[in-house]
Amino acid sequence: MQIEVFEEASPLGAEDVTAGLRAHLIAKTAVLPLIPLTVLLRDEDDRVLGGIRGQVALCWLQVDHFWVDDALRGQGHGSRLLDRAENAARMHGAIGAHLTTSTFQAEGFYRKQGYAEIGRLRDRPPGHDRIWMSKRWG
């Protein structure tokens, strides 16, 4: 047996780790769909000025990436994007949403949207915290 360390995103064998984990999850939870979800904000020239990327997995919306162009922040676009993503996830049977943010990012925004802190990692990066948040629909 040998252990290898790679400093690249998708070395040969990386997909085997994902497939193995998926097989384990299915064995423990039954077959649950993994539904990719992308919501985009475009201008009249079709340029993307914001959006959300994530997935509906294990009955929850997982928000992986959320961005709104600096010039458009504070105008309600982020709230509209998040609302659309949450509604799309509900259509696929999601019971809530979860995400991570940082103290230098959008913690206050998410709290206004009804998200609550469920965990915190201090000093990631030093001087800032990484925050896990969730919102259960009901």
For each feature predicted by the language model, list its residue ranges.
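Conserved acetyl-CoA pyrophosphate-binding loop and the N-cap/start of the following alpha-helix
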Residues: 72, 76-84
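Acidic/histidine-enriched, beta-strand-rich ligand/metal-binding domains
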Residues: 72-73, 96, 109
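Acetyl-CoA-dependent GNAT
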Residues: 3-64, 69, 104, 119, ...
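Conserved active-site tyrosine of GNAT-family acetyltransferases
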Residues: 17, 110, 115
